[in-house]
Amino acid sequence: SSSRCKRCLSSSAASAAATVKGFMTLREDSGIAGVLVNRVSGAHHYELVRDAVAHYTGLPCVGYIEKHVNLALKSRHLGLVPAEEVEDALPRIQEAARQVADTLDLPMILELARRAPVLPVAPRKYPRMDGFRMGLARDKAFSFYYRANLDALEGAGVELVPFSPLEDGELPKGLDGLYLGGGFPEVFKVRLSANISMRQSIRTALESGMPCYAECGGMMYLSESIDSAEMVGFLPQVCRMTDRLQRFGYVLVADLKTGRTYPAHEFHHAATEATGEAAYDFEIRKASRPELCWPGGMHKGNTTAGFAHLHFLSHPEWMERLWR
């Protein structure tokens, strides 16, 4: 109606409609089918935005979330505090769900989702690693894993065997390899250092030739120390924490020993320094600015370690090369 149109024009809701319109027209294939309005003051505010969006874009709104609904999560230097450390995570999710149940049009959201076209998915080709038992460091100190990487390993026939460098006294029996992912070892460095038997168990396994891939926090744990806290001591380097980001963004990792290059992502406040005559085995380049490069990462024995997070499906052969 004309009165509703005037209300759209005269209210700040028009700016919300402009934002939606901008996303719709920026790309012809945007595929935007509906709008969920966030941080509104109440039902009347939502109605203003809903009418403006409908008037200027023709899109339906599927409900709203009021700004008083507490969906905030605590954060630290690398982003959100992991779910493993949020003791009331489930009750908070349930309370948030209760609060938005009356303001979201769930049937409409599901209907719009059902109309979405099927996205093309490239066939996944995994190297076969049937029967390979891989120890997976997983606790509050080590929780940064791409779910797709774990799925890829299991798709290749790997049995993932979780263990805790914080709580367990030694590695699980009968392992063929180790995967030490990222996380917050610097937050738990005192406890990690105090678990001497686990540190010795890991070092003994690696010195005996067990294949291992250590990524970011996992690499830090294998170093001689994090700040003043003694770590596994397998890699000839020391780590220190800084008060600012050292690296952040997409990178290209060139393995100087094999000549292969892999896309990856770095995000860390830590800095490392090789000890003795040790040298780094990778050349890292900023993906958006290839002229920026720096050394990083090490091979030692059958262990490969570095700050970069890799997605195994970008180079499936990487999995087999790491642990065979």
Where are these regions (language model features)?
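Phosphate-binding active sites in nucleotide-utilizing proteins
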Residues: D130-I196, Q200-E207
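Cysteine-nucleophile active-site neighborhood
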Residues: P185-D255
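Inter-motif core of Ras-like GTPase G domains
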Residues: S1-S11
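Structural motif
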Residues: L36, Y179-G181, F307
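Beta-strand-turn-beta hairpins that frame and shape the catalytic cleft
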Residues: M129-F132, T258-Y262, H299-T304
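Internal gly/pro-rich beta-alpha loop/helix module
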Residues: A13-K125
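A glycine-centered loop/beta-turn motif at secondary-structure junctions
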Residues: P295-L322
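Pocket-forming structural segment of enzyme catalytic cores
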Residues: E224-L292
